[in-house]
């Protein structure tokens, strides 16, 4: 179906649209109040489109759409789809999956504060994400010092109390005669309020409890509460007062650097600045400031439990009313989303914007220093190996096996001296499992055959674009990661592996690529052009870079080999039966207890297992053997 036909079928309804390229990859996800009108705007006139959007439009061959009931639902769906597919042309938070959270386990009998790598719908209260693990651990340490909750995984292991109990940092729910249930519940509530920045509320509650304890002549308990109050006051006294009212708000501003945007968030709780965080967003070139902030708010607040009553931004947002409606639904009460133009709040926004600019300036300076150092190393390597061009892209191959079993190869890629993990590839050997030289030749051959095929597809795609008159600026992109050939190829091994790799490269017509073998034993290099071994100076940055690349290839191959080994060790003959997946396999083994018992059972007995039809039972018996009746 052509694009015009796909456009004609779009509904006049809210929802999300997904643009796909010739390979079926999703390259952009968007939302719309009216799908038909919004998507048609991309194809009606190129006059108002940026170069980046023109390039994207030139690659679209398929349009998929998902209808929603409301625009707010479309906004939530868009955020989830971007997170799942990571489309090339969407602006998105960088590396958000690595940011840790603090998790308050409210569903446990005795809740505790633990570190979590992701947020789940498990009834717990999550705080974060923390872009700095150091800040997260400092918060954890502080929380454990101020609020005496348990830190152990299993309270039943310490019937006499753990060390934290004996030093006064845990109320001791593990004790058989524990009777401080109310105090523990209060500590949980206070910790949650403290982590949400409601410090004044916590202090007021603690002071009230201290007075009540004194009235009941519970002087030891009153003293504990007094010490806790003093500790919290000492922690919070350095927090800067930036609002004269007891307000909770997040203040968000951004600064640009190349195709990135640095978004700074100041967290104000009860009028005090309790923290700030810096986030990086990729794909920000040609995006307006409002679009950057809108994308950040969608992605950031979809990953956090807490939404403040008010959010201040440095620029007006597109679809601000829809975003505010979504935030309000998430919070459970109205959220004000504002771009202040004057007064105290405008000054606050400008302060955050200044901090964002300073952070990105520092990042630019750091990047320039790193680039200068990296270019120096690459020039050093170019000189040592007499390369015709700077080795910006370096690829390295390694073969891994254990006694000839499960032989695998890895290909790692470094660009500009840094790993480019999106281009890493792994190969499971198909030909000669017991020949290291042949294995290396197979891996290198498969890499370049695929690369040549992708380059041919690129040419065909551009010719087709020219014929159809839909060439975007720069031309459409076709093919995959293999189409980029290296400036330098490293083979993990000696002259034998190198010789086999070069033979297959000559056969494919890619032998112009400089190729070297790197021997592990003495860190010497070999190449076809020189009879003697090449020794780079010990301690040189060029040698260190090659060692790092070689070690990364070895690590990547070993990781894949272990994965295959684990899979093989848990594989059973049931896995080879069509129609038997993990759930049915589990049901069969739970019912019969072993493969032997299944083999000895009749077809009718196997068919009695939930989810197993008579036809499936016959397949199972054919695969395992044993009596059919």
UniProtKB/Swiss-Prot annotation:
UniProt record, GO biological process: nucleotide-excision repair; SOS response
Record's keyword annotation contains DNA repair: yes
CDD domains associated with the record: GIY-YIG_UvrC_Cho
Pfam families: GIY-YIG (PF01541), HHH_5 (PF14520), UVR (PF02151), UvrC_RNaseH (PF22920), UvrC_RNaseH_dom (PF08459)
Stored SUPFAM superfamilies: C-terminal UvrC-binding domain of UvrB, GIY-YIG endonuclease, RuvA domain 2-like
Keyword DNA repair: yes
Localization of this protein: Cytoplasm
Keyword annotations of the record: Cytoplasm, DNA damage, DNA excision, DNA repair, Excision nuclease, SOS response
A GO cellular-component term linked to this record: excinuclease repair complex
Subunit and partners: Interacts with UvrB in an incision complex.
Role played: The UvrABC repair system catalyzes the recognition and processing of DNA lesions. UvrC both incises the 5' and 3' sides of the lesion. The N-terminal half is responsible for the 3' incision and the C-terminal half is responsible for the 5' incision.
Annotated protein name in UniProt: UvrABC system protein C
Taxonomic source organism: Symbiobacterium thermophilum (strain DSM 24528 / JCM 14929 / IAM 14863 / T)
Gene field: uvrC
